[in-house]
Structure formats: structure tokens, C-alpha cells
Amino acid sequence: MNWLLHSNTSLLLRITLGVLIFATLALVDYARHRQHATRWREYTLLLLAVAGAIVYGVLNDQITSTISWEYFYYGKGLEEQLGPQTPPATLPLHLAAALVGVKATWSAGLLIGVALLLANNPSKRVPRRLRNRDLLTLIPLVFLVTACVGAIGGYLGYLGLPARWNDDFDQMLRHDEWRPHRFMAVYGVHLGGYLGAALATTLAVLRTRQKRRALISN
């Protein structure tokens, strides 16, 4: 059970099982309700949000592993997986970084999708809902805002801002270890990405509710 829940090799299996569960629920909903089925559209939105997050995570970590292999090798503990050679071979590094990206983002994508669906739930005050296709248009904007905030975080990291509150980064700068400015730039990209995703999801939820209120006035 521990292998299934925590190992890297079972990650694809866990994601596949999740997709199959949602696909099965969607098929059951469609079989029962046919043209009146709605759940399958919601499950599709969740799957697309997860897929978008995975793509973002993989691309993000392909770029950042090029900027600082040290961040992944030392910071993410990949030295055992990649071997003693430094810098590590390019292809194994990028494959390992891709896996790190998938692990870090698939659950975030699920949370984004759930947040949008909850924001679109009918209530007594706002009974009308947006179409799921309208919600889908917000997902690319979420990742765009995430990328922009991540880029800002990367710039601030390159300037050495994290060293002001983290002694490890301060020591890296003092001893010029692991190309510290690049290391902190990647740290800033990742931290900024998490903050950006939270901000963007909040904005998307507010936008969803705003659009729903506009439906009432129309």
C-alpha cells in the first residue's frame, strides 16, 4: 500500500486510476440520463484542469532544470536517482524533472477544477449556472497568471531575495555554492507559481460568481 501511495513508479498508475474512475462515473451518468446528463461535463472539466496543470508542471520544470540542475539534483534530492556525475546527464535530468513537475501539479489542477465547479454551484441567491464551456475558458487564464507570477518570483529569486529570510540561501551566496543566483531563481519560480496559482484560482472563482450574477440581471 505504501508503494501505491508514495512511490514515483506508481504515480502514473494513480493518475490512470483516477482518470478511469471519472470516466466510468461520466459514462454511468450519461447512460442514466442521456441528453439530460450533466455530471460528465463536470468530470471532463476536472480532467482538463488536471491535464493542463500537468502540462504546465512538466514544461515549467524542463525550463527550470535547464536554469539550475543543482536545484533538482540537490534541492529535490535527485542525486541518488541521477548518480554521482555532476552535472548530471541531460536526458535523465529532464525526465526526472518532468516527474517532479507531474507530482507537484496534478493535485493542484484537481483543486483548480473543484474550485471552479463549487463557484458555479446554484444557490438560492444565484440560482443560475454558467455553462461548463464558460468555465473552461478560465483555466488557461489561471495558468497564464501562474506563469507571470512565477516569472516575477524567478526574477526576485535571482536577485537573492530568498537569502534575506533563509540561512541556507544566505550561506550559498556567501560561499558561492551551487550557482546560488540560478538556484534561487528556480526556487522563486516554483514559489511564485504556487502563489500565482492560488491568486489566479481566487480570481477565477470571483469572475465565475460575477458572471453568474450578471445572468440574473439579464
Which residues make up each language-model segment?
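Membrane-interface helix-loop junction between the first two transmembrane segments
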Residues: 27-45, 63-75
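Hydrophobic core of alpha-helical transmembrane segments in multi-pass integral membrane proteins
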Residues: 15-29, 143-154
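Perimembrane loop-to-helix junctions flanking transmembrane segments
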Residues: 71-93
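Cytoplasmic juxtamembrane regions at transmembrane-helix boundaries
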Residues: 30-42, 113-140, 206-218
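Hydrophobic transmembrane alpha-helical segments in integral membrane proteins
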Residues: 2-22
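Hydrophobic alpha-helical membrane-insertion segments
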Residues: 48-62, 136-160
